[in-house]
Amino acid sequence: MELCRVLLLIFSAAGPALCYEHETRLVDDLFREYSKVVRPVENHRDAVVVTVGLQLIQLINVDEVNQIVTTNVRLKQQWTDINLKWNPDDYGGVKQIRIPSDDIWRPDLVLYNNADGDFAIVKYTKVLLEHTGKITWTPPAIFKSYCEIIVTYFPFDQQNCSMKLGTWTYDGTMVVINPESDRPDLSNFMESGEWVMKDYRGWKHWVYYACCPDTPYLDITYHFLMQRLPLYFIVNVIIPCLLFSFLTGFVFYLPTDSGEKMTLSISVLLSLTVFLLVIVELIPSTSSAVPLIGKYMLFTMVFVIASIIITVIVINTHHRSPSTHTMPPWVRKIFIDTIPNIMFFSTMKRPSRDKPDKKIFAEDIDISEISGKQGPVPVNFYSPLTKNPDVKNAIEGIKYIAETMKSDQESSNAADEWKFVAMVLDHLLLVIFMLVCIIGTLAVFAGRLIELNQQG
């Protein structure tokens, strides 16, 4: 029994040792006269065929200002090296090995539209080498590719970005690159919280440059159509701006007599200014175009400032008096006679339109109270009775009081008319500002939202 255990241990330890010996001998034989600077072809006129596949893992960042898209990818490359073939039976049945990528010839694929200066693919990974000479190399890479970011419809925008891959020194007669598929592999793609992939495709291009008009250079360009998820900007930017606009409209619902109209207007303006300073970093700072959200914020700012200016006019109208302003007939006709009837302002108390009698006293006055006699005693204003100094002074005093009361009544009626005009303006502007707020919001965003809905 003990002998069996000893033999079992010996054979189990010998297995890995034999495998290591076979792989070591295989590697020594393969690379004894191998040169990694020579293309693996039998005839120098032959081309090495390289199959390229792009696997997109993660969309890391989209920099709208610098127009750089950062992605995490795996670049799968397959080709056949005729100098690295072997018979598995000669090496203990070893059919594949993994060797450092620096030890073999590799196609010098680079990202043409790289934006950070590092054009090469990561080298510090191993390749899978099969006994047929087929090599599979899938290095990971962080690509920073240039992409023309169009912010016109931000945050309801779509961006069409690309990655252009090709060999740096080999033309199409020396190395032929073929796409593994017309679409990149997104089987391991991790969804972004800001972007969603709408479409993605790859195309192979034959390019002839001016320096070499007879020699083609090949590249594979992958295009990605990305659509931004706007929920974050709707909740944190658009809805607050909309609420500021509605609050601005309600300034005209506040009674002018309260004295708080300007306080509320200035408070809204200051709050909006602070809010814009906080969120300005969320908006792409580029001068190529004004984004939708920038237009809406500008609309909101103009909306608030316009309300302040109009509020000043309304307050000025409310406090006008006949001693400073005379109401033009057209103002009376429009704001007292016409608009209240059109807008159904039935709850408004209109100013008195009764015209006081121009005569303070008739020529015949009743002086029964003065004479002490019962019943009316018609007395001519110029009768001898009225020539009595005491009576005359009393009548003059009464006339002065009556004229003063008439003047005060006229002033009060005129002031009431101005206040009524201001009240009509408030009601009218409340309706107008609410409509402008809704229509302005729809005018800025509705067209783009309808377009995106039609695109599906």
UniProtKB/Swiss-Prot annotation:
Organism: Gallus gallus (Chicken)
Signal peptide: 1-20
Entry-linked CDD domains: LGIC_ECD_nAChR_A1, LGIC_TM_nAChR
Primary location: membrane
Membrane topology: Multi-pass membrane protein
Function: Upon acetylcholine binding, the AChR responds by an extensive change in conformation that affects all subunits and leads to opening of an ion-conducting channel across the plasma membrane.
Segments on the Cytoplasmic face: 316-427
A GO CC term assigned to this protein in UniProt: plasma membrane
Family: Belongs to the ligand-gated ion channel (TC 1.A.9) family. Acetylcholine receptor (TC 1.A.9.1) subfamily. Alpha-1/CHRNA1 sub-subfamily.
GO molecular function annotation: acetylcholine-gated monoatomic cation-selective channel activity; transmembrane signaling receptor activity
InterPro entries found in the cross-reference section: Neur_chan_lig-bd, Neur_chan_lig-bd_sf, Neur_channel, Neuro-gated_channel_TM_sf, Neuro_actylchol_rec, Neurotrans-gated_channel_TM, Neurotransmitter_ion_chnl_CS, Nicotinic_acetylcholine_rcpt
Keyword Transcription: no
Segments on the Extracellular face: 21-229
Gene: CHRNA1
Catalytic function, reaction form: K(+)(in) = K(+)(out); Na(+)(in) = Na(+)(out)
Name of the protein: Acetylcholine receptor subunit alpha
Any one of the GO BP annotations: monoatomic ion transmembrane transport
Transmembrane feature ranges: 230-254, 262-280, 296-315, 428-446
Pfam families: Neur_chan_LBD, Neur_chan_memb
Glycosylation sites: 160
Disulfide bonds: 147-161, 211-212
